Amino acid sequence: MDMEKIRSVVAEKSARSNILVVGDVMLDKYYTGEVTRISPEAPVPITHVTGTRETLGGAANVAHNLALLGTNVSIACYVGRDAHCDSLLDKFKSRGIDYAGLVHTERPTTTKIRIIGGHQQMLRLDFEDVKPIDGANAEQ
């Protein structure tokens, strides 16, 4: 089977599918640049940032990939009430992902920040609360 036939079959089947993605969503943020020198304050590289980007991570990435296939996608997840959530919502809207199943909590929206110098990831910062969901949020 050639690639065009495969694309046609996937597009036809996906367009008729409705899928609910349930899981941990996250915002992946990347800061890229060039290492220019070592800091005089501590033996760590100083990176001159030349670019930034944000992408959907975790279950949000799964929903995005399904939407790219033409599937009608809805997502159910927990997020915080913060700027990172706002970024996720903007990305859901622009990709046609239904986020009516989103539940706001007092936890931060899970965000992973990666610092990349040249072609090497040098650092990852995780903003998340890994404790189990409980109380009223679990009921929702």
Positions of predicted regions on the chain:
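Short, flexible, mixed-charge acidic loops at enzyme active sites
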Residues: 32-41, 116-119
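Short glycine/proline- and charge-enriched loop/turn segments
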Residues: 37-47, 123-124, 129
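Positively charged, low-complexity intrinsically disordered leader regions
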Residues: 1-36
